[in-house]
Every structure is written in structure tokens, then in C-alpha cells.
Amino acid sequence: MPLNKRFTLTQYLIQERRRFPDARGDFNALILDVALACKAIARAVAFGELGGMLGNHDADAGGSINVQGETQKKLDVISNQYFTRMNEWGGHLAGMASEEMDDAYQIPAEHPRGKYLLVFDPLDGSSNIDVNVSVGSIFSILRAPQEAVESGRDVVEADFFQPGAEQVAAGYALYGPTTMLVLSVGNGVAGFTLDPMLGEFMLTHDKLQVPENTQEFAINASNSRFWEPPVKRYVDECLAGKTGPRDKDFNMRWIASMVAEAHRILMRGGVFLYPRDSKDAAKPGRLRLLYEANPIGFIMEQAGGRASTGREPMLGVQPTSLHQRIGLIFGSKNEVERIERYHAEPARAEMHNPLFAERSLFRS
């Protein structure tokens, strides 16, 4: 009988593996290595300024910018190191890719190579770390091409260019009031809470499901002037509340930490929109496909929700570059499908704004 009638992460993985009698232990061991990295990051986040963890990475006092053009925080760099060091040695991986690394990460020659690829955002929402807002780690596991596994060659970027539907597993860790690991191995979604006394992730939320309907949405409204008409229409209808076409009131949220947004939606429903927009022509989408949109999309779909670009299912998108950006909408199924319908409808000659249909602050 598991301790306190709860399964540990290890016990859960063993139980899942029993569904596949011919499976080896490589996959479970890889998940546990990822979990170990998340435990180390949780500890670093918890110490904060006491451990000298806050602020920008100095890179010998010159600062550092990642491949995204973003200033790296100390914890970005430290978290990336935890992920690479704790996953490179086990013999489970053919290679890795990260938000914080320009190129694919090769497994050092002194370590054996395996049949999986690991892609990750080591610290999502790190811009919030200095103000003590919840942050997290996101990861995705793919199968390496068989030819690469058999030859033992170095991985190349194209090896990672697999649609989200090809993911073997995906998950995230949330570093908040408690540390949680949320995981899907393709058989639903489970949540594990870190027991700080035992140092073990314990199964606390089994078979998580996203409610189909919701009255909450999350979007950065400061970008409204750059939104496409279908997104404007959807948000306007939500804001119109009971007096508008939706005939019910909505609440708007925005944390600026996608892991925190995803976790709230997973627990109580909602819809998250970081849509394609015209703010920067070079970046029509903001979130990274391989290590942000795909793993979160996989979790949402496994929990009965939906993930989309607005125009097509997120998990069907064919990646074309390692750090490819994309618009992302996910959450309660009926709301995401509504937004997809709005994108599919012919463009309106004039957008109807239910908030200002009768009177507007901007009328002459």
C-alpha cells in the first residue's frame, strides 16, 4: 500500500508502464530525471534573494541575451543548467533543445545516448521572478529518429521538427505556494505535489479534466489594437457580459506566466489567448511552438480541453525551426471552438463592437 494511500511519481510511472508489457525502464527513468531537475529548480526559486538567485545573469558583468533576444535572468541560466546536467548522463536521450540555447544540445561523448529527445523551457515566466509571482518549467519528450538512434550520430535541428501529436509525454512544474508537477504520458493528466519532508512528488490530482464551459478568459488587453478581427470580436463579446450576445458575464485574468495560467485553467476551466497579432511583423506569434505551445497543448487535449492557433489544431502544426513562434489559444473546449469558428467565418466588412454599439467614448 503506498505511503498515506498516495502514489509516489515512481509508483505511478510503474503502474503506467504495466500497460505495455514489453516496455523497458528508459522512459520512466527519463521522467524521474526531469522531475529531479524540477526539484532542484524549486529549491533555487524558494531561496530567492536569500540564495542570490534574483536579478539578471551578469555573464561577467556584461549581461546576457538568449536566442529569443531576451535578457536572461540568473534563474534562467541556473534552471537550464539543472535540466541539461541532470538529463545528459542517464543514457535515455539522443539530444535536447531549450529556450535558453541557440542550437540543439549534444549528449557529451562520455555518456551513452538513448532514443528520446527532450525539449524544454527551463523557467517560464521568469520576468516575474523578482516580484515573487509563480513561475514554472515546461517540457516535452519526443522519439528520436530511428536512424539517429541506430547510428549514434549527433542530433540535428530537423530531428526535433515533429508535430505536437507525436509527443510521447509532456508536462510542467509550477513553483508556487506548493510545487506541483503536472504530467501526461498519453493516458490522461495527473498532478503531483512535492512533499518537502520526503522530497517526493506525490499523486494528489488524478485524471484532471478541463471543464468544457467557462466564464473566464486570459489575454493581455494592452495588445488589443494589434489583434485580428476574430479575437477582437470574441473579447468584445465577453466584455459585453449579460447585455451582449453571450448573455453572461465573464472575468478577465492575466498573470504573464503561462504555466500559472495553464494550471488555473486545468483546475477550474477558462480560456487562454496569446493570439497571432500585428505588433511585430517578424513575430506574428509570441510563444514558442516546440517547448511551450506543444507541451501545454498536449496536456490540455489529454485533459479534455482544446489547443489551437485559431486557424488549426495546435498539435497538427508542422514545425519548421527550433525556436519557431506561434499564436496559441487553449482551454475549455467550447470556448476554443467558438474562437476557431470566428476565424473560419468570412471577414466582416465592419467589426461590430457590442461595447460601443450605442455610445462610445470616442464619438465626436
Swiss-Prot record:
Protein source organism: Polaromonas naphthalenivorans (strain CJ2)
Record keywords: Carbohydrate metabolism, Cytoplasm, Hydrolase, Magnesium, Metal-binding
Entry note: cofactor: Binds 2 magnesium ions per subunit.
GO terms classed as biological process: fructose 1,6-bisphosphate metabolic process; fructose 6-phosphate metabolic process; fructose metabolic process; gluconeogenesis; sucrose biosynthetic process
Assembly and interaction partners: Homotetramer.
Major localization class: cytoplasm
InterPro entries given in the database record: FBPase_C_dom, FBPase_class-1, FBPase_N, FBPtase, Fructose_bisphosphatase_AS
Domain of life: Bacteria
Pathway linked to the protein: Carbohydrate biosynthesis; gluconeogenesis
Annotated positions binding Mg(2+) 2: 121, 124, 292
UniProt subcellular location: Cytoplasm
This enzyme's EC code(s): 3.1.3.11
Family the UniProt entry places it in: Belongs to the FBPase class 1 family.
Name the record gives this protein: Fructose-1,6-bisphosphatase class 1 2
Record bears the keyword Hydrolase: yes
Class in the EC hierarchy, top level: hydrolase
Binding site for Mg(2+) 1: 99, 121, 123
CDD domains: FBPase
Catalytic activity annotation: beta-D-fructose 1,6-bisphosphate + H2O = beta-D-fructose 6-phosphate + phosphate
